[in-house]
């Protein structure tokens, strides 16, 4: 789970924490937790309670999604059994070319890339729709979902 903690995600912190919590509680998954702004922080040692962890850590600042996904790519051992879950508004500060390049690399490895877009406190989607369309065109699953919708989607994917 790769969670955008940049300044633009401030209104989505609660949503992001709940979404990360859904994946962390799935017993069939070995879950890693990575947060990022322009820096990447691996919080995999705190994945048992991602809601508390994400609510207590707020990085803020800029956004380097490509850098975070590049780090996550190094964690992939078995691509065909790997879900890379990105929770972000997809507003990339480090250049969209790099974001698309690393996303394509993850997808072409056989791993599944899931981009869960930001929802604010009223569940209104707030994300870069062009970036979302580009990722979807590459084969990533891109969705603006409530936690209930996500739980159903993940159950269908892994079940």
Regions found by a protein language model. Give the residues of each.
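Residues that scaffold, gate, or flank divalent-cation-dependent active/transport sites
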Residues: 4
């Amino acid at each position: 789970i790769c969670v955008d903690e940049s300044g633009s995600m401030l209104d989505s912190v609660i949503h992001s924490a709940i979404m990360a919590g859904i994946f962390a509680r799935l017993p069939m998954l070995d879950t890693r937790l990575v947060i990022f702004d322009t820096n990447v922080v691996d919080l995999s040692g705190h994945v048992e309670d991602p809601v508390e962890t994400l609510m207590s850590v707020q990085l803020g600042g800029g956004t380097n999604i490509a850098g975070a996904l590049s780090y996550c790519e190094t964690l992939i051992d078995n691509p065909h059994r790997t879900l890379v879950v990105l929770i972000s508004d997809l507003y990339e500060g480090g250049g969209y070319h790099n974001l698309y390049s690393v996303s394509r690399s993850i997808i072409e490895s056989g791993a599944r890339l899931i981009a869960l877009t930001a929802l604010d406190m009223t569940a209104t989607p707030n994300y870069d729709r062009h970036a979302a369309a580009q990722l979807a065109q590459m084969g990533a699953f891109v969705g603006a979902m409530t936690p209930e919708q996500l739980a159903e989607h993940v159950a269908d994917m892994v079940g």
